[in-house]
Amino acid sequence: MNLLIMGLPGAGKGTQAAKIVETFELIHISTGDMFRAAMANQTEMGVLAKSYIDKGDLVPDEVTNGIVKERLAQADIKEKGFLLDGYPRTIEQAHALDETLKALGLTLDGVINIEVDPASLIDRLSGRIINKKTGETFHKIFNPPVGDYKEEDFYQREDDKPETVKRRLDVNIAQGEPIIKHYRQAGIVRDIDGNKDISEVFADIKKVIENLK
């Protein structure tokens, strides 16, 4: 079983990916882990990626695609199957993944697409506040500070401000839509309502994956 998980930042993709991997005993392939392993093992693509990172440059698509190909070519992939997380990020990377899978004799069985209302994601992602004195982190909705606090006792990181979060989501939506469309045309997308609580979302995902078998 070879799967891809997609969802906007804050949609709970990381939490659900961990549950999928544990339940179905798949290999979790996340972009960050792949890069770290390739660089640590000094693979051809890992050495190349490090040369860009050390200079502070963006790693080009062909190097990222090469790192993915190196990982998918390893023996454990055919034995166990995989869950791709964080790749592809662009439609060009999706086309490159198609070519890689074809070259390796692998198929993508399903794309788990966690859908969450962007407005609620902005609330989720922009709710983080930090106590100016203690540095403690709270969330306006999910973990509000208890006690005699005033609003001016807290500050918000630039990254967490609603307008910044909205811009980030807009970029993710613009990049993600063509990828979802590409996989819809292949008939392998399974939409999951991510507005429910974590256990309900996973129950829906589990059902979908079991039906793919």
Swiss-Prot record:
Catalytic activity, EC: 2.7.4.3
Predominant location: cytoplasm
Region span, LID: 127-160
One annotated GO biological process: AMP salvage
Swiss-Prot/TrEMBL keywords: ATP-binding, Cytoplasm, Kinase, Nucleotide biosynthesis, Nucleotide-binding, Transferase
Reactions this protein catalyses: AMP + ATP = 2 ADP
Top EC class, one word: transferase
Span list, region NMP: 30-59
Compartments it resides in: Cytoplasm
Keyword 4Fe-4S included in the entry's annotation: no
Stored SUPFAM superfamilies: P-loop containing nucleoside triphosphate hydrolases
Annotated positions binding ATP: G10, A11, G12, K13, G14, T15, R128, T137, F138, K196
Domain comment, as recorded: Consists of three domains, a large central CORE domain and two small peripheral domains, NMPbind and LID, which undergo movements during catalysis. The LID domain closes over the site of phosphoryl transfer upon ATP binding. Assembling and dissambling the active center during each catalytic cycle provides an effective means to prevent ATP hydrolysis.
Function according to Swiss-Prot or TrEMBL: Catalyzes the reversible transfer of the terminal phosphate group between ATP and AMP. Plays an important role in cellular energy homeostasis and in adenine nucleotide metabolism.
Protein family per UniProt: Belongs to the adenylate kinase family.
Subunit structure: Monomer.
The protein, known as: Adenylate kinase
Organism of provenance: Streptococcus equi subsp. equi (strain 4047)
